[in-house]
Design a protein with these regions (language model features):
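Polytopic membrane enzymes that build or remodel cell-surface glycoconjugates and lipids
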Residues: 1-189
Length: 189
């Protein structure tokens, strides 16, 4: 099913395409789409799959630096954090094992969502484009791996601890409700 881009729509509603085990069916259509495009570009040439994994990992490392710049002062601490992320042996699995692409794709969209949300919150005026991008990236993270649901408590924690004070609990709930609903639809669906 990965050998034809015509199967891509089915990746979004057939859970048996990612996992053949009926008890542990995982929903990761974005990963399947990336594999299908990889196959379409270079068939089964393993090197191309590794190049894609390395490219996604490089983007993730840059996003770690960008997130670090939000919370750490100076240039060096975020840069060191990004380099540790890029070079740490624990992350080599994500680059080396083609089947681990779900982690890196999830991280790519998770970090993008968090970054857009943080920039939207730090803007003087509420930024609808940034919040919309954050929600779309969150959906992408969920379509990559289920661990992305942890973005919701992370945003709640950051609202409480780092971002400018929220005027009321009602405002906080209003801001986080779309993220909670996306996570709920993913978990229940």
């Amino acid at each position: 099913h990965l050998r034809s881009v015509e199967n891509i729509p089915q990746f979004f509603y057939r859970t048996d395409f990612f996992s053949a085990d009926p008890r542990g069916r995982m929903y990761r259509p974005l990963v399947l789409v990336s594999y299908a495009f990889n196959y379409g570009l270079d068939k089964l040439q393993v090197e191309s799959y590794h190049w894609v994994n390395m490219g996604v990992h490089a983007l993730n490392s840059a996003l770690v630096i960008a997130v670090g710049r939000l919370f750490l002062s100076g240039l060096w601490p975020p840069l060191v954090a990004g380099l540790i992320f890029a070079l740490h042996p624990i992350n080599s699995e994500v680059v080396n094992y083609i089947s681990s692409r779900s982690e890196s794709l999830c991280a790519l969209f998770f970090l993008t969502s968090f970054l857009c949300y943080a920039y939207a919150r730090r803007a003087e005026r509420w930024s609808v484009p940034l919040m919309g991008t954050s929600l779309l990236a969150f959906a992408g993270a969920l379509l990559g791996k289920s661990v992305a649901v942890t973005l919701v408590p992370l945003l709640f924690f950051c609202e409480w601890r780092f971002f400018s004070p929220v005027s009321s609990l009602r405002t906080l709930i209003k801001r986080l409700t779309p993220f909670f609903l996306f996570a709920l639809v993913y978990v229940v669906g």
